[in-house]
């Protein structure tokens, strides 16, 4: 596949936040912002993918006009950022999470 053909086939770019795209908790570099804009200009969806919950994605990302979706909770939820509503979830049941927490508590 030629490089130009591969570029045309890209439909979505998902990116991690902590220690990669962001510096600190909520600082987006100008270089990263420009790269996201360039992808958006090429009709590529630009999607943050993070272990964070939706409300902890910083405004420096959610206020960008081209950030429409976000994958949160380590892949457990997909959000429509513009509508601020969850599109789908696949979360661990609370009782299972509590059982796991209890196991780890024994190792503190």
Tell where the protein language model's regions lie, with residue ranges.
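Conserved ATPase-coupling elements of RecA-like P-loop NTPase cores
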Residues: 24-28
């Amino acid at each position: 596949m030629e490089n130009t053909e591969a570029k045309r086939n890209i439909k979505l770019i998902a990116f991690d936040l902590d220690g990669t795209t962001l510096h600190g908790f909520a600082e987006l570099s100008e270089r990263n912002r420009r790269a996201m804009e360039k992808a958006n200009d090429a009709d590529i969806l630009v999607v943050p993918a993070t272990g964070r919950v939706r409300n902890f994605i910083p405004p420096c990302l959610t206020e960008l006009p081209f950030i429409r979706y976000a994958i949160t909770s380590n892949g457990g939820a997909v959000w429509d950022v513009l509508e601020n509503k969850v599109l789908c979830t696949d979360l661990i049941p609370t009782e299972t999470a509590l059982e796991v927490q209890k196991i780890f508590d024994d190792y503190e």
